[in-house]
């Protein structure tokens, strides 16, 4: 993997907002564009459908600590920050400083004061706290080179009952392998750090949406629930 691709590894995930993909050639062209160009693409109204439904399913509450890993232009960061206000903190994590600057500016314009930007590393989100309630990966994990290492690193920042939430796409018939990520593989990486599927949500036709947790408290194994589309 080239250094240029590694430098964009988290930010590119946002190009596939909510399962709306691009053709292979276009995707590779977009990867070469500066941050300013694909911010415009990510902020298009047709790319933010179902954000509210996702936020509702997450059942965030005021005071929660949330990490939006691969935050991109802040499509999820802003509404999640609002959901956990006034005393919750949203950490927008990216490895592209220009994207983080954009999120900070966007938050200021919208009067959102509880977002903190974090410049992550290739194998570690580098969060400044270890009491995170939710680490949220929207179309991000499949873009990370060392996935097991990254989820290992992420887990150390979570509370004992913290959640790792993954939205991604299973194998597709065409396209490069980096465009998808089998849920079974994610299950395996999570199990290696004692995280298991706690909830599955049917929000998207072409994406899986799974919340992972450790067995916690008196529970021998977290109950798996299938949440149907309203």
Each language-model region and where it sits:
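Class I SAM-dependent transferase core
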Residues: 26-67, 73-75, 102-105
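Class I SAM-dependent methyltransferase SAM/SAH-binding core
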Residues: 67-125
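A short acidic, Gly/Pro-enriched loop at the edge of an enzyme's catalytic core
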Residues: 125-135
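A short glycine-rich, Lys/Arg-flanked "PGG" loop and its adjoining helix->strand segment in the class I
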Residues: 81, 148-163
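Short glycine-centered segments of the SAM/dcSAM-binding site in methyltransferase folds
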Residues: 65, 89, 161-163
């Amino acid at each position: 993997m080239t250094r240029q691709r590694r430098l964009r590894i988290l930010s590119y995930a946002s190009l596939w907002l909510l399962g709306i993909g691009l053709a292979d050639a276009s995707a590779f062209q977009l990867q070469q564009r500066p941050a300013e160009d694909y911010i415009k693409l990510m902020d298009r109204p047709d790319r933010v459908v179902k954000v509210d439904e996702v936020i509702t399913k997450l059942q965030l509450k005021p005071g929660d600590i949330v990490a939006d890993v691969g935050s991109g232009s802040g499509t999820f960061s802003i509404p999640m920050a609002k959901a956990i206000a006034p005393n919750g903190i949203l950490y927008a994590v990216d490895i592209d400083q220009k994207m983080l600057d954009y999120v900070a500016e966007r938050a200021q314009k919208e009067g959102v004061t509880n977002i903190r930007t974090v410049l992550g590393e290739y194998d570690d989100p580098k969060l400044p706290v270890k009491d995170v309630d939710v680490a949220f990966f929207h179309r991000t994990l499949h873009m990370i080179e060392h996935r097991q290492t990254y989820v290992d690193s992420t887990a150390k920042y979570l509370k004992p009952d913290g959640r790792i939430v993954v939205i991604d796409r299973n194998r597709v018939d065409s396209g490069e392998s980096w465009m998808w990520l089998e849920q079974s593989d994610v299950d395996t990486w999570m199990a290696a750090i004692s995280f298991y599927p706690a909830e599955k949500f049917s929000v998207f036709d072409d994406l899986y949406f799974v919340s992972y947790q450790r067995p916690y408290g008196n529970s021998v194994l977290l109950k798996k629930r299938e949440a149907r589309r309203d």
